Amino acid sequence: MLQAKLSSRLPLNALLRIHHGAYAPCVHSLSNRFFNTEGGRTRGGLHSDCSVLRRVIYSQSAFRPSLCKTQHYGTRSFSLSSAAVVNSAPAPVRPYLRLMRLDKPIGTWLLYLPCTWSIALASDPGCLPHLGLLSLFGTGALLMRGAGCTINDMWDKDFDKKVVRTAARPIASGEISRMQALVFLGGQLSLALGILLCLNYYSIALGAASLSLVFTYPLMKRITYWPQFVLGLTFNWGALLGWAAVKGSCDWSVCLPLYFSGVMWTLIYDTIYAHQDKEDDVKVGVKSTALRFQEQTKPWLSGFAVAMMSGLVAAGVNAEQTLPYYAVLCTVGIHLTHQIYTLEISRPEDCWKKFVSNRNLGLLLFLGIVAGNLWKERRDTLLQNEEMFR
């Protein structure tokens, strides 16, 4: 009887989604629909039928992981995670959001953080970083990371089909054609250009110069075992651009060491990332530092970490940074040491965990730069007071 009622009042695809556990909100909406559309029945009878329905649905073990917890008065909890935002978007839009990796924001963070370091270093002593510039660069990082992923997937369509982790990407799976991706790429680059035009002329020219790296990086994995180095040159361009946006030009004594540190950082985290796919990369002919270093990965990463820390010290000295900055650098060094020492390159899940932990490292360094910059005002005040009493 219950089955007949359901089948007569619900679309077939909705019932199939319930059976396979792919449509979490159906528990709430299905019972409400059943309750509200059943005419001429007593409230108690409806309640008992709905209870049976819930017991049937909840008994499906495959469905349990997808359930949304409900609170009193019918209010459901919801998630604001990037993956949840993508999954809740209209179906025609979802492939494009996945193409720009909106469901995996770690890449946007890793592109954005060097920009924040540079903006914070360029701020006046005792001042917080310019919030407007941080917002502009954050939006630009989101768009350019999406554009980079679109270019990468257009180049790598045939490779992605052969790798388990990437076979479901929108272009490789056929959800989006290359022409559709090209149009979408044009839209992203147009919006990013609008962001760039908000900056000064020096920054506009500097930003435009990075486009060659954006387009050529995806090709590097075909011709060299060092594509991560080219990615580092691309991803850390914001270390130059951020300073220029604040000051109107680059102070190379600060910007170059900072940029160098960012490149070393990218070599660390993207080599770790590449170890997830090394077996598939060998099969399809893709090159990476993970394949170049193999069992010598940890010594190489240790060398990159030392180089990164040296560059950060040089940038701090040339930018006249203060005690809080160097205290945080010690913490950054500890983070890198732990990350490399505990890395298990044969376990993809550990590689992913170490890779995403670099967002926290980058945020920590940003906070250290901000704290060091605020401390400059205190230091300058103390120096002025000493001169007054001499």
Question: Can you describe what each PLM-predicted range is?
Answer:
Residues 115-116, 120-155, 165, 186-197, ...:
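Membrane-embedded alpha-helical segments that form the functional core of polytopic membrane enzymes
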Residues 1-68:
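N-terminal chloroplast transit peptides
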Residues 97-98, 147, 166-257, 337-344:
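Intramembrane alpha-helical segments
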Residues 136-139, 157-207, 283-325:
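Multi-pass membrane catalytic core of lipid/isoprenoid biosynthesis enzymes
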Residues 108-115, 184-191, 231-240, 298-313, ...:
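Core segments of transmembrane alpha-helices
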Residues 78-96, 149-176, 270-294, 342-350:
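Cytosolic, membrane-interface loops and tails of multi-pass inner-membrane proteins
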